[in-house]
């Protein structure tokens, strides 16, 4: 089988940088899990959009008299969490469902759980964190109502993101436990090194089944009647 060519992120041809990952839901993810994995992918996209809206809201916050530190941090969060979210929690869950990998499931639970906690903090909106959450938006109405209205939008989006993350992690955990996943399996994958690039379920099946017999088995040759002992 020829090696699959990377297709994500889909970059224009004039850019001298090639895609880093191969992503094809219908080709690599089992049919019964494709909807869930696609929803987690869209959740990553929604969270990236939330960070972009948050950057604009932090600019309005700054213009309205708030601290410029929030705008600077919002810019850092956008640049940092957009690629890191894809690599650190979406790719693990993608590979986990692609290959039924306990190690990647564990990595997803740990990193995505931390992402969920961070998103809840962003939704709350502590000042100086670079996130326009509920506390910062509501508290700014007394200084600049117009800017505060803009700040409410990322507060809502962060809240929706946190709610969807909670639902996603519960659904993935239910599937993981129902399929017999365990920490021991994750340790085995770590010790054998298969966690780096676990083979797809199809590849595992082909390796397991293989060709136990030649396509045209040889007909046994028995001795003639006069040659029996």
Curated annotation (Swiss-Prot):
Residue positions where Phosphothreonine is found in the record: 194
GO CC, one annotated term: recycling endosome membrane
Domain of life where this protein originates: Eukaryota
Keywords annotated in UniProt: Membrane, Phosphoprotein, Protein transport, Transmembrane, Transmembrane helix, Transport
Sequence intervals crossing the membrane: 40-60, 61-81, 105-125, 149-169
Topology Cytoplasmic: residue spans: 1-39, 170-229
Places the protein is found: Membrane
InterPro entries the UniProt entry points to: SCAMP (IPR007273)
GO BP terms: protein transport
Region ranges (Disordered): 208-229
Location, primary (coarse class): membrane
Membrane-topology descriptor: Multi-pass membrane protein
Family membership noted in the UniProt record: Belongs to the SCAMP family.
UniProt function note: Probably involved in membrane protein trafficking.
PANTHER family the UniProt entry points to: SECRETORY CARRIER-ASSOCIATED MEMBRANE PROTEIN 4, SECRETORY CARRIER-ASSOCIATED MEMBRANE PROTEIN SCAMP
Name of the protein in question: Secretory carrier-associated membrane protein 4
Organism per entry: Homo sapiens
């Amino acid at each position: 089988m020829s090696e699959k060519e990377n297709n994500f992120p889909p970059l224009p041809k004039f850019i001298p940088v090639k895609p880093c990952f191969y992503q094809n839901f219908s080709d690599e993810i089992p049919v019964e899990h494709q909807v869930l994995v696609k929803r987690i992918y869209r959740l990553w996209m929604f969270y990236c959009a939330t960070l972009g809206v948050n950057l604009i809201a932090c600019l309005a916050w700054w213009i309205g008299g708030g601290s410029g530190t929030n705008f600077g941090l919002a810019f850092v969060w956008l640049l940092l969490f957009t690629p890191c979210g894809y690599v650190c929690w979406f790719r693990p869950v993608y590979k986990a469902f692609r290959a039924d990998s306990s190690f990647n499931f564990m990595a997803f639970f740990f990193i995505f759980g931390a992402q969920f906690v961070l998103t809840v903090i962003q939704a709350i909106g502590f000042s100086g964190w670079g996130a326009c959450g509920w506390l910062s938006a509501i508290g700014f109405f007394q200084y600049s109502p117009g800017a505060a209205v803009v700040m409410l939008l990322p507060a809502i989006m962060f809240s929706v993101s946190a709610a969807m993350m909670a639902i996603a992690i519960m659904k993935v955990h239910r599937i993981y436990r129902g399929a017999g996943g365990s920490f021991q399996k994750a340790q085995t994958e770590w010790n054998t090194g298969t966690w780096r690039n676990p083979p797809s379920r199809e590849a595992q099946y082909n390796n397991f089944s293989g060709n136990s017999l030649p396509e045209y088995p040889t007909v046994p040759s028995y001795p003639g009647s006069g040659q029996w002992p």
